[in-house]
Amino acid sequence: MADNDRTALRRKALRRGLMSEYVAAVFLMLKGYRILALRHRTRLGEIDIIARKGDLAVFVEVKARHGEAAAVDAVSVIAQKRIRAASDLWLARQADQARLSQRYDIVAVMPGRLPRHFPDAF
């Protein structure tokens, strides 16, 4: 495969990921969550969405797949550890950290269907 083809595929995947994260964020807002950050980057990794509902901080991994099971299975143990490490850094910077509970969710974004939210997925 030529470099141009690989670059085009990467760009397409990035666009799909960005759109999926936006769709997931809107979906979560409709469910009453306040979105605090999209694509939050730390030195330990990236968190797709950081949301809050009351005293609950939710760290969300978004996966665009054709099915729910494929989306959930796509979040590897290594990815879970990376997200947890990044969330620890984010939490350490919050003034009300002691009050906050935390949860790790997955939102599956599938073509032609509403997103599916998996609370407390890992």
Curated annotation (Swiss-Prot):
<dbReference type="InterPro" id="IPR003509">
    <property type="entry name" value="UPF0102_YraN-like"/>
</dbReference>
<dbReference type="InterPro" id="IPR011335">
    <property type="entry name" value="Restrct_endonuc-II-like"/>
</dbReference>
<dbReference type="GO" id="GO:0003676">
    <property type="term" value="F:nucleic acid binding"/>
</dbReference>
<protein>
    <recommendedName>
        <fullName>UPF0102 protein Rleg2_4331</fullName>
    </recommendedName>
</protein>
<dbReference type="InterPro" id="IPR011856">
    <property type="entry name" value="tRNA_endonuc-like_dom_sf"/>
</dbReference>
<comment type="similarity">
    <text>Belongs to the UPF0102 family.</text>
</comment>
<dbReference type="Pfam" id="PF02021">
    <property type="entry name" value="UPF0102"/>
</dbReference>
